[in-house]
Design a protein with these regions (language model features):
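Extreme N-terminal leader/targeting segments of oxidoreductases
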Residues: 1-32
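Glycine-rich FAD pyrophosphate-binding loop
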Residues: 50-70
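N-terminal Rossmann-like FAD-binding beta1-loop-alpha1 element of flavoenzymes
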Residues: 32-57
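C-terminal catalytic lobe of FAD-dependent flavoproteins
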Residues: 165, 288, 292-303, 307-413
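Helical element adjacent to the flavin cofactor pocket in flavoenzyme catalytic cores
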Residues: 160-201, 205-214, 219
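Active-site substrate-recognition segment that forms the wall
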Residues: 115-123, 210-250, 254-346
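Flavin (FAD/FMN) cofactor-binding and adjacent substrate-gating region
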Residues: 2-13, 81-87, 110-177
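Glycine-rich active-site loop/strand segments that organize a redox cofactor
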Residues: 70-101
């Protein structure tokens, strides 16, 4: 599956790249080659170079063209798998260590995102988890309906929990600033290389790149899986959708009077936030099967917002507010919802499968992979416990689609009964 590519709001508000895509001498030698210019690949390359290794980072298109640069811009602790799933896969004794690793990733991101150097990442603290179900958690931090309406006014939202350690930001700007930092430490960033394949000595690309390297890390996420027959069997590309409205600051002041980001607790629920120019970013849905054209994503977005904010949409229609941007992106999911990280063969390693929760997990696992590749054999010990389960291609995608619809039905019942 490939996502329908269209220009995003991030593209139109991004900083200019602060690096020049490198030219590689034919058969140039490197210690490591990283395939994939998202957050995982950049982090791995950065931390390898920090340890003195020579590193080339290859990107099929542009840095941030994949999920890392076109997601909703949410960063929190945790993983795509919930704690029950984590305990079932790796064992209860290791779940606390796994949770700590997710928190370490969040702290790594916060340290950069809120620094002066990363000011264009426009980081804002606070994410509110919204509940639509009638089952309110027994938590002293829960915002009841009346308190919740200080932050969001929508008839279906019953309760909320504020996470002040989480934040939202401009992911493409973050990535471009980090790429500049990565290049300055000595990594050769090579963009627009096309499709790649490996051989006994290194990497060859359809764009004419031919380089030698000792080890290769695949950090392609939901993109580029066709280039690696092993990862293609272990990870499914799952599509999700985002739209952005035209500016409507006054309307948002009434219905979403907070600068914190918001998202509901459903497995494939909605996530949304105000953007600095007065627009609303709205994320929605997943699909393992369908490729939606842009006009359908726009229509779906408007109807989705209306289903949760009918009064707000009435004002939007009155003021002729439109959906100015709509796009899709591919997340990489393994069947157990945990990352596929570790050794593929003697020379190749995988760093993917973050499942829509990669803004904290991808950079910290990029760092751990770099530690592993430079001699710390214990840095990935948790991931040796995660089984490599086949996803079975089309059958797996069909199964994922059925599972999504099953979970959606459960969410529907929990909201009404």
């Amino acid at each position: 599956m490939s996502a329908v590519h269209s220009r995003t709001w991030y593209d139109d508000t991004s900083v200019s790249p602060g690096w020049q895509s490198s030219q590689v001498i034919h058969n140039e030698n490197f210690d490591f080659c990283i395939i994939g210019g998202g957050l995982a690949g950049l982090s791995c390359a950065y931390h390898l170079a920090e340890k003195g290794a020579s590193v080339a980072l290859l990107e099929k298109s542009d840095i941030g063209a994949g999920a890392s640069g076109r997601n909703g811009g949410f960063c929190s602790t945790g993983w795509a798998a919930n704690n029950l799933q984590i305990c079932r896969v790796i064992g209860e004794n290791y779940s606390t260590e796994f949770e700590a690793l997710g928190l370490e990733g969040l702290n790594w991101m916060r340290q950069r995102a809120f620094s002066r150097r990363y000011s264009k990442a426009e980081a804002v603290s606070g994410v509110i988890s919204l509940g639509l179900s009638k089952n309110t958690p027994e938590d002293l931090k829960v915002l009841t309906k009346d308190k919740l309406e200080e932050f969001v006014i929508g008839p279906r939202y019953r309760w909320g929990i504020v996470d002040k350690s989480a934040f939202h930001f401009h992911p493409l700007n973050f990535l471009r600033i980090f790429a500049e930092e990565t290049e300055k430490i000595g990594v050769k960033i090579i963009e627009n290389i096309g499709l790649v394949k490996t051989n006994k000595t290194g990497v060859i690309s359809s764009g004419g790149i031919n380089l030698r390297c000792k080890r290769i890390v695949w950090a392609t996420g939901g993109y580029g899986l066709d280039s690696n027959s092993i990862l293609k069997k272990l990870v499914l590309p799952i599509q999700t959708f985002i739209c952005v409205t035209s500016p409507m600051g006054a309307i948002l002041d009434k219905y979403i009077p907070t600068n914190m980001a918001l998202g509901d607790e459903r497995r494939a629920g909605n996530y949304f936030r105000r953007l600095p120019d007065g627009r609303l970013l709205w994320g929605m849905g997943v699909s393992a099967m369908q490729q939606k054209p842009i006009h359908k994503i726009r229509s779906m977005g408007f109807q989705n917002i209306k289903a949760h904010f009918p009064d707000m949409v009435h004002h939007m229609e009155k003021d002729r507010i439109t959906i100015d941007y709509a796009w899709s992106g591919l997340m990489a999911y393994a069947s157990h919802f945990l990352p596929v990280v570790g050794q593929i063969n003697d020379r190749e390693f995988s760093l993917c499968g973050f499942g829509g929760h990669g803004m904290n997990t991808a950079p910290i696992l990029g760092k751990k992979m770099a530690n592993f590749l430079t001699g710390d054999s214990n840095s990935l010990h948790l991931f040796s416990r995660i089984p490599k389960q086949k996803t079975y291609g089309l059958l797996g995608r069909l199964g994922a689609e059925i599972e999504y619809r099953r979970l959606s039905f459960i969410d529907y019942l929990s909201e009404r009964y």
